[in-house]
Amino acid sequence: MHRRRRDNLMTPAEMVASMKPPQSLSTEDDDGSRRDSESSADVLKSNEEFQARMIPEDDDANSVTAQPTWTVLSDTEIKSVLVVASFAAAISPFSTSTYYPAVFAISQDLGVSVSKINLTMSSYQIFQGVAPTITAAFADTYGRRPMFLVCFAIYFVANVGLALQNNFTTLLVLRCLQSTGSSGTFALAQAVTADITTRAERGRYLIYATLGSTLGPFLGPVIGGLLVKFLGWRSVFWFLLCMGTVFALLIFIFFGETARPIVGDGSVPPQSWNRSFLQIRSKGITSLKPNLASLERRKSRPNPLTSLALLWDRENFILSVSGGLLYAGYSSVTSVLASQLQQRYKYDAVQVGLCYLPVGFGSLLAYRTTVRLMDWNFEREAKKQGLVIVKNQQTDITRFDLEKARLGFVFPMILVCSVLLVAYGWQMHYHAPLAPILVTMFLIAIILTGVMNAIAALLTDVNRENAAAVGAAMNLTRLLLGAGAVAVVGPLNKSAGIGWTATVTAGLWVLMMPTLRMVYRDGFVWRAGENERVHASNVELAALVRS
């Protein structure tokens, strides 16, 4: 099992005194085999006793260990950095959503079926999952800013080629290249959020960190529909090229490095080649004294396998697959909506684009509703467990049941979303009026955005030192599952109908819930046991060195 390094770990003595799990938990013999001598009821009781020892008593609630300030950036500066990063990440969802209204026109112009054009969406999602693992590895070593600029350079080349190509094979290859450039920016934006925000405050900053990626599904189909109708489908790629140029200029001029191994809390100047245009103009002059103690360990060389290694951890794996299944179901809805509206309702590209607006409105509204619920539940659990939250100070999670704080509200939301997805499928199947279909899509977007953000926040929280890598790992699982869903949904719709397709998807969501609940119930114990094993290994290593 992959061993993750946790921040703010306790000393070995404290680990032995307060973290050692009772013998009733599953232990290992010398030969590595697992033993479990008690009944399941006894094990559950022991787990509860273990958690009770790990969570501070109420008497200690007011004793706060002094923590350093997490970032020197002001609240306004944090929001500005997150907005710039989120707009840079917007090229990924824009490249997906502006393409939807063009599918029918491209298939007619190139003389291929819509199913073949759907393969370009599946291949796009596959590369959207794989490419960030490489981007994240280099970003954790060399910084976020240079990798943003590299991603944009690849993106520019792909869009020029897509606007000029004339056959399906070239379209397929260049869509993969376009995905390689655009998808890395999404993982980088997630890493920037982890660099400059604390766990307790992350929810309230999510609206800024995800503004660009939310506007993609919101505005992309409308813009794509207008472009296809009045200028032709090639204009979609020229538009993406121009938009990418604007966002790249924002990074080049305004965006400063945020990776903590390079700039720490923001007070340490980055390398001269890794400064924004504004920093170069000011010649690096700052009134801040560099806080070298805030620098984190820097990886000596990029390792693209880090993202895959993180998935070897059972908590990471369950969370990533759960988020992936939710995303796959969501993708299966949005990817076929365009063709369904054109075939069943005889809508043109502009009308199809307008029908995507409720999805965007729902996603945007989620950051004013369900994401605030995430912060509220975090504060409630912290108070319940006797943890004091201090503004701009990182929360120590070694004695905090973070899983209950993040996942406490997601299970009823998944059930409601499953019911809504079934309703959407059968409404489309029976050619229901468009109004209830759009309302259903709006509600799905609100609820599902909140659930996926809660899962993503938990993954980032427990892997903060590998923020870019865990973002890439999450993208890898969800986009590979999403690509599979998009590839399967077309044939499944033809054979069984969209009603049964939606019903099967909702059933998978419900079947996923018991596994996700294992993380909610036992994730804290898993992390505590892993921390103890890491410390035990460190003690053994130190003893060998001394001898």
UniProtKB/Swiss-Prot annotation:
Glycan-bearing residues: 118, 167, 274, 493
Record field: transmembrane: 81-101, 146-166, 206-226, 236-256, 317-337, 347-367, 407-427, 432-452, 469-489, 496-516
Role of this protein: MFS-type transporter; part of the gene cluster that mediates the biosynthesis of squalestatin S1 (SQS1, also known as zaragozic acid A), a heavily oxidized fungal polyketide that offers potent cholesterol lowering activity by targeting squalene synthase (SS).
Short name of one Pfam family: MFS_1
GO cellular component assignments: plasma membrane
Protein name: MFS-type transporter M6
Membrane topology: Multi-pass membrane protein
Family per record: Belongs to the major facilitator superfamily. CAR1 family.
Gene3D superfamilies: MFS general substrate transporter like domains
Source species, domain of life: Eukaryota
Major localization class: membrane
Region Disordered, annotated ranges: 1-45
GO MF annotation list: transmembrane transporter activity
Localization, UniProt: Membrane
Keywords: Glycoprotein, Membrane, Transmembrane, Transmembrane helix, Transport
UniProt cross-references to InterPro entries, sorted A to Z: MFS (IPR011701), MFS_dom (IPR020846), MFS_trans_sf (IPR036259)
SUPFAM superfamilies: MFS general substrate transporter
